[in-house]
Amino acid sequence: MEDDRDRLIVIVAGYPREMEQFIDSNPGLRSRFTRYIDFPDFEDQELSQIFGALCRKHGLSLTPDLKEKTLHHFHWKAENAGRDSGNGRMARNTFEKVVHEQADRLSKAGIYDAEALSILEAADLESPAEPMWREYRKSGRGYIVKCEHCEATYSWNSAIEMPVAKCDKCGREFNAEFGMLIE
């Protein structure tokens, strides 16, 4: 590393505690790795957006109920699942499980048409947050979206297909594909 330091970049990545143990494992590492970038865990809305992007990439659409249930699923995971909860990998794993459940549901029903294969439903997401989602729906609290530029808040409805919205306050566009729970 010393001989080529003007041409060499070494990047190591991992969870904070394990990276600290790695750096401490050899006295010479701390002086060689002098720059650190912390990436915070994704919020539940961001994990839902990653999930939505994976669905779009694979030509799949979500029912309004699944969009809501997804928010509750990632919210529950963030509060209960520990340090891996805000990890983008969790969104990918959830996507893969949902697609698997959809395939099971459709094959059991003998449905094989292209339209059905392109729609993911709330029943396709097995989630420990299901009771919370059902209670939240009964409460009538609804959902919101926030402009990430100016923090203006708007009501959000899962039945409206609007991945991007324009903020009335600052005039900039922001992601409105998934809302947030009203706490």
Predicted regions and their residues:
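Residues immediately within or flanking Cys/His clusters that coordinate Zn2+
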Residues: 142-144, 164
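C-terminal helical "lid" subdomain and adjoining coupling/linker elements of P-loop NTPases
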Residues: 77-140
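Short, cysteine/histidine-rich loop/knuckle motifs that typically chelate Zn2+
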Residues: 148-149, 169
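Conserved RecA-like P-loop NTPase ATPase core
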Residues: 33, 47, 51, 91
